[in-house]
Swiss-Prot record, chain A:
InterPro entries: DNA_clamp_sf, Pr_cel_nuc_antig, Pr_cel_nuc_antig_C, Pr_cel_nuc_antig_CS, Pr_cel_nuc_antig_N. Coiled coil: none annotated. The lineage of its organism: Eukaryota, Metazoa, Ecdysozoa, Arthropoda, Hexapoda. Residues 61-80 bind DNA. GO terms for cellular component: chromatin; cytoplasm; nuclear replication fork; nucleus; PCNA complex. It comes from Drosophila melanogaster. This is Proliferating cell nuclear antigen. Likely to be an auxiliary protein of DNA polymerase delta complex and is probably involved in the control of DNA replication and repair by increasing the polymerase's processibility. The gene is PCNA. It holds the Pfam family PCNA_C.
């Protein structure tokens, strides 16, 4: 028996919005510590890792470990039926081939439930090792989304260059070049507006805009985003989900060639 | 202490598969082409040398900071795909080297030892792609064939069941040509798939493709420049072939999805050749004849694997190779189906091949072609003293009509395309011309348009207005009549080894004429030169192109590969200076000046050398065009401009045109005569080692829409035309008999 209950459907909606562009389907791995999702997009260039801790739920029960393969498009359709303030509960029997998603209005007057078929997905599980990153940048999530959107107009790839002075995003294409530099914030008044750079070694890496822009779909989940970089290692873009867990995107770098 | 840097992503399932995963050196695979190595990896500390371009220089100060700092973060790296297949430890190293350097063109290549997929018994697609890549970089034809034969030999020895797909992939076919299964994937669809798989923009890919002129290369660059989190399992030849067939059979969005899924798994040059296969142009210069030769050499190499080095085989076993090639080509011309031939050569002795691969109705055989002559005199020179027959040469469409034991009729064109659906009217009345007991047959004939009211032949242009597909018998406006001139198979017996006189006798025994529907070609058996001349004039009056001249008894079998004595054709316009016009390919254009500004003012033409599979320049041309012609040509060819000359164009740098074109259009050209030229390359090495042949005063006659560029005039034909000029003949008394294989009309 698996049961997980969240006070507000809006969080789950936002989580789905943050991953459904990259992934068509994914497996939700449930255990008594929480819910885990890990999957690569079809092109195997990026990877999504979602962690929702059990203690972040209003109610969480998971008797046996359970893997539920879901079509994320269908899941998003179901979540559209919920009001933002509704309670949401996910339920499944052990070894079931369906999952039930139930919405209850705040005043308990309306209860709707949806049953969705599960899928058998044989996805690769990748072990994600720990790494010392050369650079870790924390910045406002909105700012990052804006930068990615703006730079995508100039080129299909973005160069992220992190030094002691700050972090620079640049793109060059037929139109010309674009550079956006962010310096570390001097004094931190509002934590959510700060730009914080921890650097051991300068790093310059190139990434495809398409994926970065897909990652920024998670912006509504968090005020801050954390970019971790290291040469020849995938970029990690992390959005914390307050009191519940985090969503991390991994993106394999592009190989810079001299022509572009 | 376990350093985090040496760890990398790995499949969790691997842990169970391999109890103690050996320490691997994590590294990002720059070219994404190591199938058996971790693709992405962690940070410094690894003994791998980092690509310099990717690292910024590190000041000592920063370095010291580096050590104590610990932002513990997880990182991503990928691991080997299948633990069960190739080992991860030392063998992985070896195989990695083999994969990257797989090169079947080296002298030391050993078909067994260097076939790095030995233990898997499944041919990796990468090995084939590597072979293609090496062949593409190779200049000489013999070397290309040798390289391909090395690969084939490895496949024969290690993974014989992959030989059929390997062969089909090498000539970019999905099935025997007569089945007409084609890929037909639009370039834009492919571009979209590449975009999706590599995160690039469609517009960028388009502009880059325009610049480079080859989507295959663009695909490879896009693939190589974007790393992946986790490399999908390596592709193998049989799956790729199967998937390509699937792609050909389905349509719509799912086609694009299939392409996409395959493309994601491509590594390095696989991407190039996979995309090229889909476009339909492999561009490695291997065509049917080269392929058959390569197969023959591979067979001989296989037989002598222990005797000597593979690179020596072609020299030591020259005769055996020649014999094998002939047997193979003979079998292929009567049974053009690799699905039958290849299992047969693997299983049986090559000498049995002909019996193992018999001809049968429903499967087209290569038609006997004719070569042009300049006049009646030349015919008699060539056929001196033999019994000959002349038949009218009808101006229509060549048709091989088959009927099998079940009574099913199929009709094949000159190029072995299935035309059955085009002539439902013929099939409906196919019983009428049988005489006596006929169960199965293959006849060779010409289909011409027929004026029912006036009972006469209509020109070819009328025939070409007939619909090609989904022909409804009620709606046929152009009636046709079939002129039968040969019988190749009757009631289960092949007749190709019989002489023409016997075949003709059997033809008359089993078939009869039906007015306006089935006729025998008008023929005259004579050895009198005046009668031939007169017969030629009659044929022209009868709306024919001229005559076909054949021997009746000597060398009169219908065996293409054995080079039965060729048929000759005598055309009505033989009186002009050069016996026949030439059909040449436009490969370049020079910008027009003055009145011709804005269009091309001149063009560079080439003939096709079937032996070397290359286009050789033969002349520049600027006359014979109306202004309207130039406008039309410029518009059409403007769409086929490529940024640089194709590797298979042979030309002198002094002739470099303003624009190079794809070899897409064939023009009929007449000229005053042919001469040796220091700058043109046509037939170079045939008549003269240094010089090629060029045309004097070339004139444009018309576009030959019915011919594709590989059916253009062949270098041998050019050489022959040159040598048969009176002037040249008088100079060199001993004119060699040129052998020509291709038709020329």
């Amino acid at each position: 028996m698996f049961e997980a209950r969240l006070g507000q459907a809006t969080i789950l909606k936002k989580i789905l919005d943050a991953i459904k562009d990259l992934l068509n389907e994914a497996t939700f791995d449930c255990s008594d510590s929480g819910i885990q999702l890990q999957a690569m997009d079809n092109s195997h260039v990026s990877l999504v890792s979602l962690t929702l801790r059990s203690d972040g739920f209003d109610k969480f029960r998971c008797d046996r470990n359970l893997s539920m393969g879901m079509n994320l498009g269908s899941m998003a359709k179901i979540l559209k039926c919920a009001n933002n303030e509704d309670n949401v509960t996910m339920k499944a029997q052990d070894n079931a081939d369906t999952v039930t998603i139930m919405f209850e209005s705040a005043n308990q007057e309306k209860v709707s439930d949806y049953e969705m078929k599960l899928m058998n997905l044989d996805q690769e599980h990748l072990g994600i090792p720990e790494t010392d990153f050369s650079c870790v940048v924390r910045m406002p999530a909105m700012e990052f989304a804006r930068i990615c959107r703006d730079l995508a107009q100039f080129s299909e790839s973005v160069v992220i260059c992190c030094t002691k002075e700050g972090v620079k995003f640049s793109a060059s294409g037929d139109v010309g070049t674009a550079n956006i530099k962010l310096a570390q914030t001097g004094s931190v008044d509002k934590e959510e507006e700060a730009v914080i750079i921890e650097m051991q070694e300068p790093v310059t890496l190139t990434f495809a805009c398409r994926y970065l822009n897909a990652f920024t779909k998670a912006t509504p989940l968090s005020t801050q985003v954390q970019l971790s970089m290291c040469a020849d290692v995938p970029l990690v873009v992390e959005y914390a989900i307050k009191d519940l867990g985090h969503i991390r995107y991994y993106l394999a770098p592009k190989i810079e060639d001299n022509e572009t | 202490m376990q350093k985090s840097i040496t760890s990398f992503f790995k499949k969790k399932s691997d842990d169970t598969d391999s109890p103690s995963p050996p320490k691997k050196i994590p590294k990002i695979d720059r070219k994404a082409e190591l199938p058996d190595e971790p693709t992405i990896k962690a940070e410094n500390g690894s003994p791998e040398v980092k690509p310099k371009a990717e690292r910024m220089s590190v000041s000592p100060e920063e370095k010291t900071k580096n050590a104590p700092k610990s932002v513990k973060e997880e990182t991503v790296a990928t691991t080997d795909r299948k633990v069960t297949t190739i080992g991860l430890n030392s063998t992985a190293k070896d195989s990695k080297v083999d994969v990257e350097n797989y090169d079947p063109s080296t002298d030391s290549y050993h078909p067994l030892k260097h076939a790095y997929w030995q233990d898997k018994k499944v041919t990796p697609y990468l090995a084939l792609a590597r072979t293609f890549q090496v062949i593409e970089e190779t200049k000489g034809r013999l070397k290309m064939i040798d390289t391909l034969s090395n690969f084939f030999c490895s496949v024969m020895l290690v993974s014989p069941s992959d030989l059929v797909p390997s062969v089909y992939l090498s000539i970019n076919q999905l099935a025997p040509a007569y089945e007409g299964l084609e890929l037909g994937v639009a370039e834009t669809t492919l571009m979209k798939a590449i975009c999706k798989a590599t995160g690039r923009n469609l517009a960028h890919i388009k502009s880059q493709t325009h610049l480079i002129g080859d989507l295959g290369i663009v695909a490879e660059q896009s693939r190589v420049s974007q790393r992946m989190m986790f490399q999908p399992a390596p592709l193998n030849v049989r799956d790729v072939f199967k998937k390509l067939r699937d792609i050909a059979k389905i349509s719509g969005q799912s086609k694009m999805d299939l392409v996409y899924n395959m493309f994601v798994a491509c590594r390095s040059s696989e991407a190039r050749f996979f995309i090229r296969s889909l476009i339909g142009k492999l561009r490695i210069g291997i065509a049917e004849q080269s392929l058959l030769t390569a197969l023959a050499i591979a067979l001989v190499k296989k037989n002598h694997i222990d005797d000597c080095k593979a690179s020596k085989v072609p020299d030591v076993y020259k005769d055996e190779i020649a014999e094998t090639t002939l047997l193979l080509k003979t079998a292929y011309s009567q049974c053009p189906n690799y699905d039958i031939i290849i299992p047969a050569i693997l299983e049986y002795d090559i000498k049995e091949l002909q019996e193992r691969c018999p001809m049968h109705p429903g499967m087209p055989l290569r038609p006997m072609l004719a070569q042009p002559t300049k006049g009646v005199h030349e015919v008699f020179e060539r056929f001196g003293g033999m019994h000959i027959t002349c038949e009218w040469k009808y101006d229509g469409e060549r048709a091989q009509i088959h009927r099998n034991e079940k009574g099913e009729i199929s009709i094949f064109s000159r190029n072995s395309e299935n035309n059955t659906a085009k002539y439902p009217d013929l099939i409906a009345r196919s019983k009428g011309f049988l005489k006596g007991e006929v169960e199965s047959y293959i006849i060779d004939s010409e289909i011409v348009a027929w004026d029912v009211e006036r009972k006469q032949i209509l020109p070819f242009q009328v025939l070409s207005t007939r619909k090609r597909k989904n022909v409804d018998i009620e709606e046929i406006k152009v009636q046709v009549c079939v002129y039968i001139f040969d019988l190749l198979y009757i009631n289960g017996k092949a007749l190709v080894t019989k002489n023409l006189s016997e075949r003709r006798k059997l033809l008359l025994e089993h078939f009869q004429e039906v007015e306006g529907e089935w006729k025998f070609a008008t023929a005259l058996d004579t050895n009198d030169i005046d009668e031939v001349q007169q017969f030629l004039e009659e044929s022209v009056k009868g709306n024919c192109e001229g005559l076909m001249v054949k021997t009746l008894d000597e060398e009169a079998t219908y065996e293409i590969a054995k080079r039965s004595r060729n048929w000759l054709k005598l055309k009505k316009d033989y009186i002009s200076n050069v016996g026949d016009s030439l059909d040449l390919v436009v490969i370049g254009g020079y910008k027009g000046k003055g009145r011709r500004t804005g269009t091309y003012g001149g063009f560079l033409l080439a003939c096709y050398d079937t032996e070397n599979e290359e286009y050789q320049t033969i002349c520049k041309i600027g006359t014979g065009f109306t202004d309207e012609d130039l406008q039309v040509h410029s518009e059409f060819l403007g769409k086929h401009v490529v940024s640089s000359a194709k590797s298979y164009y042979r030309y002198d740098p002094s002739l470099e045109p303003d624009h190079w074109f794809e070899p897409v259009q064939v023009w009929e050209i007449k000229c005053a005569d042919l001469s040796l030229s220091p700058i043109h390359r046509a037939a170079i090495g045939i008549v003269d080692g240094e010089r090629g042949i060029s045309l004097r005063f070339p004139r444009f006659i018309r576009i030959r829409d019915d011919k594709n560029s590989e059916n253009a005039t062949d270098a041998n034909q050019v050489a022959h035309m040159y040598q048969s000029q009176d002037q040249v003949k008088n100079n060199q008394k001993t004119s060699t008999q040129m052998e020509m294989e291709d038709e020329f009309y």
